[in-house]
């Protein structure tokens, strides 16, 4: 941006102001996008949003509690329990062998027997889903806290740890397969959701 020469008959202050305008513009650019740019705290009120007061100590304490690994694990445990129970009841509902007595195959099961089997299967699925959800969520939170990053590697590492821990109950080979399978599943879900 070259400064234009002052017109004939123009005053000296006008010529100086026109020469300084590009200079002020370039200084402004340095503060906005250049080397002198600094991080700014953007308040919602300055952006046209609703201004919010500063957070109280109670609000900060509640936020810290809700961001803790224990809370995340408990939330995943409860969510897994509910989802697992619903999944167990659903699968028991479509299973044709619910309430089936192998001693008397021609007898029709009563509603009480069918509901009892559905409840048992729902509770079994609920417990398993709750344990897996709590283990995965807690492990992912701990890995994220240790690494200091929130990326796809956290879910893969925690998936491997969770799958390996579940699989090691059946032996070393099952633990390695569980580690790889759960890590691959976690990576696929993380890739699909992000």
From Swiss-Prot:
One of its GO terms (biological process) is protein insertion into mitochondrial inner membrane. Its main location: mitochondrion. Disulfide bonds join 69-141, 160-179. GO terms for cellular component: TIM22 mitochondrial import inner membrane insertion complex. Keywords: Disulfide bond, Membrane, Mitochondrion, Mitochondrion inner membrane, Protein transport, Translocation, Transmembrane, Transmembrane helix, Transport. One of its GO terms (molecular function) is mitochondrion targeting sequence binding. It is found in: Mitochondrion inner membrane. PANTHER family: MITOCHONDRIAL IMPORT INNER MEMBRANE TRANSLOCASE SUBUNIT TIM22. This is Mitochondrial import inner membrane translocase subunit Tim22. It comes from Bos taurus (Bovine). The gene is TIMM22.
